[in-house]
Amino acid sequence: MQINKYIDHTILKADAPKSKVQQIIDEAKKYDFMSVCINPTWVSYASQELKDSDVKVCTVIGFPLGANTSELKAFEAKNAIENGADEIDMVINIGAAKSKDWNLVESDIAAVNAVKGDKLLKVIIETSLLTDDEKIKACQIAKAVGADFVKTSTGFSTGGATVHDVKLMRQTVGPDMGVKASGGVHNLEEAKAMIDAGATRLGVSAGVAIMEGLTSNDNY
């Protein structure tokens, strides 16, 4: 198992200075991680820093609340892609999901999907705020719209990825769609548990700890 290729090496904290973003980029190059996951303000910089590597640039849209309008999410995604993003992790309209307004959840995802072109779209459903039935419905909609992945969490809400949720999401979307576990994966043992449950990508700030067989204290 090339576990490095499961890892989106992540820094999304509001107070992360350029030096920390550079550290994440350098570590991603060293360990040949699948991507760095960074806030949109750093996309242009990361794209330049990673242009001679295989590491992708991943960014977040409508993050972390998912409460922006669909039009704004689409603009944000388009702008990120123009700046060099290879992968887009968008947050669903969580309030719409809790209101059972599934048409709005669908059109919101579709608005971003329409501008992604050949880039990857991951849909964050924020599992800690949804019932199992809502998780299933959100995953079904993301798949129907044409997203490439469903993703558990922002890492900024009440909880992160769990084995239960990853299994449920995998069962819902079937074998061909990506499932990203993010938030609360701190070490190699936890990473393997998520992969065994069906995750094909891991959103972690603990990428180096996972590779070194250590445990990180970071929440994401």
UniProtKB/Swiss-Prot annotation:
SUPFAM superfamilies registered for this protein in UniProt: Aldolase
EC assignment: 4.1.2.4
UniProt xrefs under Pfam families: DeoC (PF01791)
Record carries keyword Transmembrane helix: no
GO terms for cellular component: cytoplasm
Keywords: Cytoplasm, Lyase, Schiff base
Major location (coarse): cytoplasm
Superkingdom: Bacteria
Matching Gene3D superfamilies: Aldolase class I
The protein's annotated pathway: Carbohydrate degradation; 2-deoxy-D-ribose 1-phosphate degradation; D-glyceraldehyde 3-phosphate and acetaldehyde from 2-deoxy-alpha-D-ribose 1-phosphate: step 2/2
Compartment(s) of residence: Cytoplasm
Gene Ontology process terms (BP): 2-deoxyribose 1-phosphate catabolic process; carbohydrate catabolic process; deoxyribonucleotide catabolic process
Catalytic residues (UniProt): 89 (proton donor/acceptor), 151 (schiff-base intermediate with acetaldehyde), 180 (proton donor/acceptor)
Catalytic reaction list: 2-deoxy-D-ribose 5-phosphate = D-glyceraldehyde 3-phosphate + acetaldehyde
Coiled coil: none
GO molecular function, one term: deoxyribose-phosphate aldolase activity
Protein family: Belongs to the DeoC/FbaB aldolase family. DeoC type 1 subfamily.
Function: Catalyzes a reversible aldol reaction between acetaldehyde and D-glyceraldehyde 3-phosphate to generate 2-deoxy-D-ribose 5-phosphate.
UniProt name for this protein: Deoxyribose-phosphate aldolase
Organism: Lactococcus lactis subsp. lactis (strain IL1403) (Streptococcus lactis)
Gene: deoC
